[in-house]
Regions:
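N-terminal leader/signal peptides at the extreme start of proteins
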Residues: 1-7
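N-terminal signal-anchor/signal peptide hydrophobic helix marking the start
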Residues: 7-20
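Aliphatic-rich helix starts adjacent to a transmembrane/signal segment
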Residues: 10, 25-55
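Preference for short coil/turn "hinge" residues that link or interrupt alpha-helices
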Residues: 22-24, 29, 111-112, 119
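Short, conserved structural patches
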Residues: 38, 46-137
């Protein structure tokens, strides 16, 4: 029996192993990017809630009235970037808002509207993440 030529077997085995390896590696990078974005959004929502507590809720509690706070609790981009600098990578800008009608609990929502996942395997399920913090009063 004649022995077959073994040239190129290593390259073929590398191709079989490299494709799943690189897909897994980029999926891990993409999920890590999503996780740090979600953590930064939670941090930004918490900072907005603290700003509401200090600037609006404290005055309403002293005057014994219902707080009437709406809009962006951290109106400048510099204040938001100081709290969560990762959200500004790639030219993205997060939004932070409070509903116009005050109900208990007061909810502060931070979102990243133009965020998209790099890997197409996720679809659109993880695009435009948002996080919120509720303040009971």
């Amino acid at each position: 029996m004649r022995k077959l030529d073994q040239r190129g077997v290593g390259a073929m085995e590398f191709c079989l192993v490299a494709v799943p390896l690189f897909i897994l590696m980029f999926a891990i990078f993409d999920l890590g990017r999503y996780a740090i974005t979600m953590q930064s959004l939670r941090t930004l929502a918490n900072a907005g809630a603290r700003a509401i507590m200090i600037n609006c809720y404290t005055n309403a509690a002293i005057q014994k009235t219902t707080p009437a706070c709406s809009g962006d609790p951290l109106p400048s981009d510099a204040a938001k970037q100081a709290v969560a600098p990762f959200l500004y990578n790639g030219g993205l800008t997060p939004t932070l808002n409070v509903p116009a009608t005050v109900t208990s609990p007061l909810t502060v929502t931070a979102s990243q509207p133009n965020f998209t996942m790099l890997m197409p395997i996720w679809g659109t399920a993880l695009n435009a993440p948002s996080a919120s913090t509720s303040i009971p009063f």
